[in-house]
C-alpha cells in the first residue's frame, strides 16, 4: 500500500479514485493532480513506480489536507461561535446554517424528534 499524506491509499483502485481516500481531495482535485504529475487516471496505484508515487506525494503536499484541513474547519466554526454572529448561533443550536427551512425537514441537522410531554 502506498502512503500519501499519512493515509494508506488502496492499491487495487485507479489513481483518481484512490486519491479521493484523502480527506480534502475530491474527484476534481484528484484529476488535476494526475494531470500535473503526468500520471494516467486509469492506472492502478500498485502499477505506479516509486518515482510516480513520490510525485503524487509532492503534489498532494501543496494542498491543505487531512488533519490540517479538519483543524482549519473546526477553528473557523469555533470563530463563528465566539463572534456570536448569526451563523455561529445556528451552529450552536444545531440548526441549518445556510437559510434552509426548518418548519418541516431539517431532521438530519436537528436530530430525532423529541416528543412533547403532557
UniProtKB/Swiss-Prot annotation:
TM region(s), chain numbering: none
Protein name: Small ribosomal subunit protein uS13
Record-stated family: Belongs to the universal ribosomal protein uS13 family.
Keyword terms: Ribonucleoprotein, Ribosomal protein, RNA-binding, rRNA-binding, tRNA-binding
UniProt xrefs under PANTHER family: 30S RIBOSOMAL PROTEIN S13/40S RIBOSOMAL PROTEIN S18, SMALL RIBOSOMAL SUBUNIT PROTEIN US13M
Chain intervals for the UniProt region annotation (Disordered): 94-118
Keyword Signal included in the entry's annotation: no
SUPFAM superfamilies on file: S13-like H2TH domain
Record carries keyword Protein transport: no
Subunit organization: Part of the 30S ribosomal subunit. Forms a loose heterodimer with protein S19. Forms two bridges to the 50S subunit in the 70S ribosome.
Source organism per UniProt: Actinobacillus pleuropneumoniae serotype 5b (strain L20)
One function term, GO molecular function aspect: rRNA binding
InterPro entries: Rbsml_uS13_C, Ribosomal_uS13, Ribosomal_uS13-like_H2TH, Ribosomal_uS13_bac-type, Ribosomal_uS13_CS
GO CC terms: cytosol; small ribosomal subunit
GO BP annotations, alphabetical order: translation
Record's function text: Located at the top of the head of the 30S subunit, it contacts several helices of the 16S rRNA. In the 70S ribosome it contacts the 23S rRNA (bridge B1a) and protein L5 of the 50S subunit (bridge B1b), connecting the 2 subunits; these bridges are implicated in subunit movement. Contacts the tRNAs in the A and P-sites.
Gene: rpsM
Amino acid at each position: 500500500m502506498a502512503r500519501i499524506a499519512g493515509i494508506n491509499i488502496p492499491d487495487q483502485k485507479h489513481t483518481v479514485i484512490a486519491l479521493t481516500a484523502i480527506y480534502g481531495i475530491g474527484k476534481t482535485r484528484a484529476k488535476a493532480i494526475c494531470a500535473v504529475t503526468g500520471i494516467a487516471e486509469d492506472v492502478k496505484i500498485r502499477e505506479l513506480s516509486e518515482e510516480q508515487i513520490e510525485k503524487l506525494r509532492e503534489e498532494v503536499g501543496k494542498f491543505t489536507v487531512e488533519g490540517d484541513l479538519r483543524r482549519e474547519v473546526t477553528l473557523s466554526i469555533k470563530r463563528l461561535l465566539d463572534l456570536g454572529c448569526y451563523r455561529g448561533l445556528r451552529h450552536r443550536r444545531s440548526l441549518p446554517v445556510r437559510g434552509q427551512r426548518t418548519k418541516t425537514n431539517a431532521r438530519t441537522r436537528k436530530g430525532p424528534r423529541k416528543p412533547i410531554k403532557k
